[in-house]
UniProtKB/Swiss-Prot annotation:
Gene: rimP
GO CC terms in record: cytosol
Keywords on record: Cytoplasm, Ribosome biogenesis
Keyword Thylakoid attributed: no
Source organism (scientific name): Photorhabdus laumondii subsp. laumondii (strain DSM 15139 / CIP 105565 / TT01) (Photorhabdus luminescens subsp. laumondii)
InterPro entries associated with the record: Ribosome_maturation_RimP (IPR003728), RimP_C (IPR028998), RimP_C_sf (IPR036847), RimP_N (IPR028989), RimP_N_sf (IPR035956)
Source domain of life: Bacteria
Family label: Belongs to the RimP family.
Protein name: Ribosome maturation factor RimP
Length: 152
C-alpha cells in the first residue's frame, strides 16, 4: 500500500519507541481535515488494552513533540487493529492469505474502486484476490485502503 511521504517519515520516527514498549507497529494513517488525525495501530500477542494505548500515546507524543513533523493541528489516536484489521504491508497480505479483504483503490480498475474478495497470493508488490470466483491482480501501490472482513 502506498504510504505518503509524511506517513513514511512518521513510521520511521515512531517504530523504535513502539517496539521498545513490546508492541508491533501495525501501521498508521494521517487523515487530513480541519483538525487532522494521526491514527496509529499497535498489536501484541496478548492483545491491546487501554493502558497499552496510553503508554504508547505518551511515548509517541514525546517523540512527535521533539521532532515536530506535522505542521497542522491534529489529534493523536492509538488503537488496536480491531476486527476489521487494516492491511498496510506486503507481510500483512501474506499473513492473511485465505482471508476475505475489502479494498479501495486509488485508481479504478474495470470502472470500480471498491473490491471484496479472498486474498489468494502475494507476489512482490502484487496481490491476487479471488472476486466472485475470478482472480483479480492488484498493485499494492494502487491500494488506498485494505481491511479484513470479519465473519461471525
Amino acid at each position: 500500500m502506498g504510504l505518503s511521504t509524511l506517513e513514511q517519515k512518521l513510521t520511521a520516527m515512531i517504530s523504535a519507541p513502539v517496539e521498545a514498549l513490546g508492541f508491533e507497529l501495525v501501521g498508521l494513517e494521517f487523515i487530513r481535515a480541519r483538525v487532522s488525525t494521526l491514527r496509529i495501530y499497535i498489536d501484541s500477542e496478548n492483545g491491546i488494552t487501554v493502558d497499552d494505548c496510553a503508554d504508547v500515546s505518551h511515548q509517541v507524543s514525546a517523540v512527535l513533540d521533539v521532532e515536530d513533523p506535522i505542521s497542522v493541528l491534529y489529534n493523536l489516536e492509538i488503537s488496536s487493529p480491531g476486527l476489521e484489521r487494516p492491511l498496510f504491508t506486503t507481510e500483512h497480505y501474506q499473513r492473511f492469505i485465505g482471508e476475505e479483504v475489502s479494498l479501495v483503490l486509488r485508481i479504478a480498475m474495470q470502472n470500480r474502486r471498491k473490491w471484496l474478495g479472498i486474498i489468494k497470493t502475494v507476489d512482490g508488490e502484487m496481490i491476487t484476490v479471488t472476486v466472485d470466483g475470478k482472480d483479480e491482480v492488484f498493485a499494492l501501490s494502487n491500494i488506498q485502503k485494505a481491511n479484513l472482513v470479519p465473519h461471525f
